[in-house]
């Protein structure tokens, strides 16, 4: 019971991790009421360059990191997505915990890379962002 009260009282840092096309954004969409701001570098990239968001990945990543630091400093709950392809997300989890956030990790695993590729293809057809097949396979 005490643990549940902490979950309600503490700011939440919810991390959605998994390979590209695994459903991180889909899962996150079900938990929108649990956070105050959303840190989504893919969405930021789409805002910067709607025609080719991949060209804006570096700028979007910087803006996402800026939002992360803002959320930590202001004690604002947030979700963040990652493919876990680097160590920086682990450091962000530690930083959030050290700053009093309740850190929750959701890992979405898919048992075949073909499913990820099909999901990405469907996402692109509906206006979502593209990720190159070789990158998806490498991260898988």
Swiss-Prot record:
Residues bound to ATP: 18-25
Lineage: superkingdom: Bacteria
Pfam family, one: Zeta_toxin
Keyword presence, RNA-binding: no
InterPro entries (UniProt xref): P-loop_NTPase, Zeta_toxin_domain
GO terms, molecular function: ATP binding; kinase activity
Signal sequence residues: none
UniProt entry tagged with the keyword ATP-binding: yes
Alphabetical keyword list: ATP-binding, Nucleotide-binding
PANTHER family to which the protein is assigned, alphabetical: SLL8004 PROTEIN
Protein name: Uncharacterized protein HI_1395
